Design a protein with these regions (language model features):
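Small/polar beta-strand repeat architecture
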Residues: 10-100, 104
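All-beta strand scaffolds that present successive hydrophobic residues in beta-strands
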Residues: 83, 115-119, 138-142, 165-173, ...
Length: 184
């Protein structure tokens, strides 16, 4: 676990996104951006822990507030599940090109390990075609197409492929008219 302390946020330069102005609400805040990884310890030697997969950032000697936390019990996530060969087309008000009173996400993945989304066509969504949440791990999203989103153009909309999970692979995916076609 990499806690989001005030010192670390300052070190990362993420305390203020207001172009030097005092707009602190735009920056990161302690405790809100903690980074967690789910890994297995392969070996425990003099040099430290050897993990089954790399971390998404390096941890040095100056990162004393980082810690390893044991997860008790069995892995509680669904395993080896997927969605494939499907079309998801959201109905919307055709008289309103900015309609948002309809489906926002096509496939929402949470609490899943070793999952996939394959060969899925998405149409007319307001938000994301695929969302992998923080409790999703080892997810593959491939050969998917997102077309003709219907929503306003603004925050939290049209983030076509949104990855907050870990060890995820997105490949051969296509998106039209997204605000941010891939977000991690």
């Amino acid at each position: 676990v990499r806690p989001s302390t005030k010192e670390w946020i300052q070190k990362m330069g993420c305390a203020d996104f207001g172009a030097g102005k005092d707009l602190g609400y735009w920056g990161w805040h302690p405790g809100e951006i903690d980074v967690r990884w789910t890994r297995s310890v392969v070996s425990d030697g003099k040099g430290g822990l050897q993990l089954d997969a790399p971390l998404s950032m390096s941890l040095g000697q100056d990162d004393a507030e980082c810690f390893v936390q044991r997860i008790a019990g069995n892995d509680w996530r669904l395993k080896n599940v997927g969605v494939e060969n499907l079309t998801i087309d959201s109905e919307y008000d055709t008289t309103n090109p900015k309609d948002e009173n309809h489906a926002w996400e096509g496939v929402y993945i949470n609490k899943v390990k070793d999952g996939w989304v394959r060969m899925v066509n998405f149409r007319h969504l307001a938000g994301s075609a695929v969302v992998t949440q923080r409790d999703a791990s080892r997810i593959t999203v491939e050969d998917c197409i997102s077309q003709a989103p219907v929503s306003e153009i603004g925050g939290y909309r049209r983030r076509t492929f949104l990855c907050m999970g870990e060890q995820c692979l997105f490949q051969r995916c296509y998106s039209e008219q997204g605000m941010h076609d891939f977000v991690a």
